[in-house]
A protein has these predicted regions:
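Active-site charged/polar residues at nucleotide-handling catalytic sites that mediate phosphoryl
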Residues: 23-24, 101
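A short, GP-enriched loop/loop-strand-helix hinge that lies immediately N-terminal to
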Residues: 2-4, 24-67, 82-85
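Conserved metal-phosphate-binding beta-hairpin within the catalytic cores
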Residues: 205-235
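Active-site nucleotide/adenylate-binding loops and adjacent lid/helix of ATP-dependent enzymes
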Residues: 63-150, 160-165, 194-197
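ATP-dependent carboxylate/phosphate-activation module, predominantly the ATP-grasp catalytic core
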Residues: 125, 129, 133-134, 145-208, ...
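Protein kinase-like catalytic core scaffold
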Residues: 105, 165-167, 225-230
Length: 235
């Protein structure tokens, strides 16, 4: 089944989805991309009420706190969860922002999938050069401390139920990507890491998240400290 693209044609996607639900008996909608997850979250109440379907994603007020990378980093800072130094980036605060994060650093859009819009900058001149085009293309964003990582990434996958309990968790240690410099994981192992599970579950508790969430974690090479990078708010 082919449907309109939710990002480029949100109205047509909505019409398609509602027609499909009216004609097809569906019990649960499980969004598999950031775009569909955001749309389902924004329209969750209507879809569940009219079509009698359950949407496996929180309402948008909660969803947005995880999906928006700036809001997530601000939350981590408030509650003391490990994360890279991150600050809102605007045309007027480039010098102040870079003084906080230091160089090298990453320009990161608040809303993006994968590595889209992420730009590495190693000095203030480069930041001044590339920021306008990144902002024009991807919208609001942050400047984030560049993590010299160990070469290993972690995915922490959790399911928090409506009673605040963790119904399941998995920690995946990603050893290799394709392409090699960053992409889709192609060599991973499941590991036991209660520390990572506890850190990530505490974040979900603070935003009252219900359902599945997938954290991306880096490990700093020199200190061995973990850093929350983002949440993929979908299955």
């Amino acid at each position: 089944i082919l449907c309109p693209d939710v990002k480029n044609e949100p109205e047509n996607f909505g019409l398609f989805l509602r027609k499909f639900l009216a004609e097809t008996p569906i019990n649960v909608i499980i969004p598999l991309s950031d775009g569909t997850a955001a749309y389902i979250s924004q329209n969750k109440n209507e879809l569940e009420k009219i079509h009698g379907v359950r949407c496996a994603v929180p309402g948008y007020e909660i969803f947005h706190k995880a999906h928006n990378k700036q809001l997530l980093m601000e939350l981590c800072r408030r509650i003391g969860a490990p994360h890279p130094k991150t600050i809102e980036l605007t045309p007027d605060n480039l010098v102040q922002a870079s003084a906080y994060t230091g160089f090298p650093a990453l320009i990161k859009p608040n809303i993006s999938e994968g590595a889209r819009g992420i730009v590495y900058v190693n000095d203030i001149d480069r930041l001044h050069e590339v920021f306008p085009s990144v902002q024009a293309t991807f919208g609001a964003g942050t400047l984030q401390e560049f993590i010299h990582h160990s070469g290993v990434y972690y995915n922490v996958m959790l399911y928090r139920d409506r009673n605040g309990k963790c119904l399941g968790s998995t920690v995946i240690k990603i050893l290799r990507y394709f392409p090699l410099k960053g992409g889709t994981s192609c060599y991973s192992v499941s590991v036991e890491n209660p520390e990572l599970t506890e850190i990530c579950f505490r974040v979900l508790e603070k935003i009252d998240w219900i359902g599945f969430a997938d954290f991306d974690i880096m490990q700093e090479a020199e200190s061995g400290d973990y850093k929350i990078i983002e949440i993929n708010p979908r299955t």
